[in-house]
Amino acid sequence: MRCNACWRDLEGRAISTTCGHLLCTEDASKILSNDGACPICDQVLSKSLMKPVDINPNEEWINMAMAGISPQILMKSAYRSVMFYIAQRDLEMQYKMNRVVAQCRQKCEGMQAKFSEKMEQVHTAYQKMGKRCQMMEQEVENLTKDKQELQEKFSEKSRQKRKLDEMYDQLRSEYESVKRTAIQPANNFYPRHQEPDFFSNPAVNMMENRETIRKDRSFFSPATPGPKDEIWPARQNSSNSGPFDISTDSPAIPSDLGNRRAGRGHPVYGGGGTANPQSTLRNLILSPIKRSQLSRSRPQLFTL
């Protein structure tokens, strides 16, 4: 058995009440001293409503208590005793259940407090994220506007660049046309002809192309008014037009060459002075060949 107030195991003597509850001596004295009520059914208790009982009676008390009592009374007493025991077990089970429920309620309250705190944190975080999403949406809108403005500026700059490229191409074409126009008169005024190469093989090219050069009159300057002499005068047998001067390793200059130069206003070789350097160079190159033909009668001075 257990005390219905403190639920401690009862040993020895206990106090039973008329309301069918069992108390320990300490709790019963507290109730009587304070004029309190039963802790189970809240019935006001007094000393007359309480009776001390022996929890573990001896054999002698059992034999003396049952003596002289009719079986009907014994059966009725046994029934009440059994019902009291069942009531005590029910109270004990209820106490245990209440205790478990209290523990579970305490745990649930703790968990509810934790979950409430978590929910508050989640709600706060949700509000922060909502504000941040609004800020991000505003920022995206601003960036979209900036992007549109930059696209418009880029399109304008691209259009200006294309226009500048077109202007540059036009100016370049005009510059090229002006350049070609400026170079064209010079090419027309000084016509160029394909001249023979005198220096690749002089001994062969000069002899082969001599007649061609003589026939090509485009190398000569315009004719000078007045009498003309031959470019290559005929050979004279006078003593003044002597042979080549071997001592000086150069051909002798004819004596009448100076008189002819002084008496005429145009050069000996038919050119116009320094006006036509190509004709002068050609005459200077061909003059030894002509003189060598005129002096074939001279013996060979050098032999290979």
From Swiss-Prot:
It catalyses: S-ubiquitinyl-[E2 ubiquitin-conjugating enzyme]-L-cysteine + [acceptor protein]-L-lysine = [E2 ubiquitin-conjugating enzyme]-L-cysteine + N(6)-ubiquitinyl-[acceptor protein]-L-lysine. Keywords: Chromosome, Coiled coil, DNA recombination, Meiosis, Metal-binding, Nucleus, Transferase, Ubl conjugation pathway, Zinc, Zinc-finger. It comes from Arabidopsis thaliana (Mouse-ear cress). Disruption phenotype: Normal vegetative growth but fertility defects leading to reduced seed number per silique, due to abortion of male and female gametophytes characterized by abnormal tetrahedral structure becoming either asymmetric tetrads or polyads containing more than four products, because of impaired class I crossover (CO) formation during meiosis. It is found in: Nucleus; Chromosome. It holds the Pfam family zf-RING_5. The keyword Nucleus applies. This is E3 ubiquitin-protein ligase CCNB1IP1 homolog.
